[in-house]
């Protein structure tokens, strides 16, 4: 099964660019070339936003992250391709008793919250509390959904595989 899965992945149209300190201009250029070459491009993932630079002068890092956020939104519209942009959280979450992330915890910019159509957080109590009675459980919280409802879904977290599964299936 492992060989079959590896073979399937090897043949999948997945393109990885692990360029360090990439600028927004470089991402835009590479994404446009990829879209021209593969018109059915289905998704772009940025891991993670704070590792990027805007390539444009900004007064501070908050403004720079705001420029990156807006530029990714424009790129998604221009290419008609969804973009998932991962983001760090601020340290504020560590200072609260309830460690579940909230929108204001998005690091270095309120514009991330503003620009995003959907914001999803993952929370695992056992990450913060070793003796938690929530071992093997995760919460996926849709904190913002511009065109739909927000809610929290509980999933099973299979640490051994770094995999999430329906509670009923686990």
Predicted regions mapped to residue ranges:
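Cytosolic-facing regulatory segments adjacent to core modules
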Residues: 1-40, 54, 153-156
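Phosphate-binding/switch region of NTP-binding enzymes
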Residues: 63-165, 170
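Catalytic P-loop NTPase motifs of RecA-like helicase/translocase cores
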Residues: 52-53, 69
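Conserved ATPase-coupling elements of RecA-like P-loop NTPase cores
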Residues: 53-60
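Hydrophobic "anchor" residues on beta-strands that sit immediately upstream
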Residues: 42-43, 113
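Conserved Walker B
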Residues: 49
């Amino acid at each position: 099964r492992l060989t079959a899965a590896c073979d399937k992945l090897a043949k999948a149209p997945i393109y990885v660019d692990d360029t360090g300190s990439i600028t927004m201009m470089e991402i835009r250029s590479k994404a446009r070339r990829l879209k021209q070459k593969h018109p059915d491009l289905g998704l772009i993932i940025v891991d993670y936003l704070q590792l990027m630079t805007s390539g444009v002068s900004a007064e501070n890092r908050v403004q720079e992250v705001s420029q990156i956020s807006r530029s990714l939104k424009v790129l998604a519209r221009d290419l008609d391709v969804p973009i998932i942009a991962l983001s760090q959280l601020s340290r504020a979450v560590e200072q609260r008793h309830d460690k579940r992330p909230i929108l204001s915890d998005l690091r270095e910019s309120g514009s991330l919250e503003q620009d995003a159509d959907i914001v999803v957080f993952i929370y695992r109590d056992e990450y913060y509390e070793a003796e938690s009675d929530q071992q093997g459980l995760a919460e996926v919280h849709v904190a913002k959904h511009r065109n739909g409802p927000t809610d929290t879904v509980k999933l099973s977290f299979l640490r051994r595989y770094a995999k999430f599964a329906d509670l009923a299936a686990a």
